[in-house]
């Protein structure tokens, strides 16, 4: 049996307990050997985060330290060119054995935007896609994805076979925590204790991150 590896990308600006809880739940539900938190470089379609890539990475490293099965993959931050998901998947897949299963976790909103991604139709050549659906999400995928879903969608997440090529949906009620909310609290000099892991809080405070300029 090959290994089961998950990738969970995000800007993690900062990483918070909502990210961590989703990661732990998915690692358990899919019996993953490893779930890699993958801090995104400034994606070509996203604004630049206000904290440096090295600082975002340091926070994720502290968040996963000592947490079974959770690791960090920094490859997107180490590239010196625009960072596309397809490049990451090709790079990760090249390091795995042929029978290893690779799972990419993405949220519903990101999934609906998939047709705008660079070489998006090639993503499934390298991995399975697990879409995390929130109860409050719109339930209709865009037209551009309907043929793909008809051909590749699997109702039972446990039925994903082979190294990649299929899509499944998992209902998840995320914790009501957002990085935007955390940045706003910190900018107003408020506490974010219990919204981020303690080690992340310590790092934020030590480096005075997200504080409003005086």
Swiss-Prot record:
Pathway of action: Cofactor biosynthesis; NAD(+) biosynthesis; deamido-NAD(+) from nicotinate D-ribonucleotide: step 1/1
InterPro entries assigned to the protein according to its UniProt record, in alphabetical order: Cyt_trans-like, NadD/NMNAT, Rossmann-like_a/b/a_fold
GO biological process: NAD biosynthetic process
Alphabetically ordered keywords of this record: ATP-binding, NAD, Nucleotide-binding, Nucleotidyltransferase, Pyridine nucleotide biosynthesis, Transferase
Catalytic activity: nicotinate beta-D-ribonucleotide + ATP + H(+) = deamido-NAD(+) + diphosphate
Enzyme nomenclature, EC number: 2.7.7.18
Keyword Isomerase: no
Disulfide bridge partners, by residue number: none
Matches recorded under CDD domains: NMNAT
Molecular function terms from GO: ATP binding; nicotinate-nucleotide adenylyltransferase activity
Function: Catalyzes the reversible adenylation of nicotinate mononucleotide (NaMN) to nicotinic acid adenine dinucleotide (NaAD).
Protein family per UniProt: Belongs to the NadD family.
Protein name (database record): Probable nicotinate-nucleotide adenylyltransferase
Organism encoding this protein: Pseudomonas paraeruginosa (strain DSM 24068 / PA7)
């Amino acid at each position: 049996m090959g290994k089961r590896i998950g990738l969970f990308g995000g800007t993690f600006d900062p990483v918070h307990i909502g990210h961590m809880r989703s990661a732990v739940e998915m690692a358990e539900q899919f019996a993953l050997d490893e779930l890699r938190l993958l801090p995104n470089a400034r994606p070509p379609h996203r604004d630049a985060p206000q904290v440096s890539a090295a600082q975002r990475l340091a926070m994720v490293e502290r968040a996963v330290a000592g947490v079974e099965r959770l690791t960090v993959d920094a490859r997107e931050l180490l590239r010196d060119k625009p960072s596309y998901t397809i490049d990451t998947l090709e790079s990760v897949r090249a390091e795995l054995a042929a029978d290893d299963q690779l799972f990419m976790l993405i949220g519903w909103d990101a999934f609906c935007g998939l047709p705008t991604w660079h070489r998006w139709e090639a993503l499934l050549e390298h991995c399975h896609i697990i879409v995390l659906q929130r109860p409050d999400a719109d339930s209709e995928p865009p037209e551009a994805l309907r043929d793909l879903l008809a051909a590749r969608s699997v109702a039972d997440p446990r039925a994903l076979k082979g190294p990649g090529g299929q899509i499944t949906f998992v209902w998840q009620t995320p914790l009501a925590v957002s990085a935007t909310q955390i940045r706003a609290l910190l900018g107003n000099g408020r506490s974010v204790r219990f919204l981020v892991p303690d080690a992340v809080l310590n790092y934020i405070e030590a480096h005075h991150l997200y504080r409003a300029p005086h």
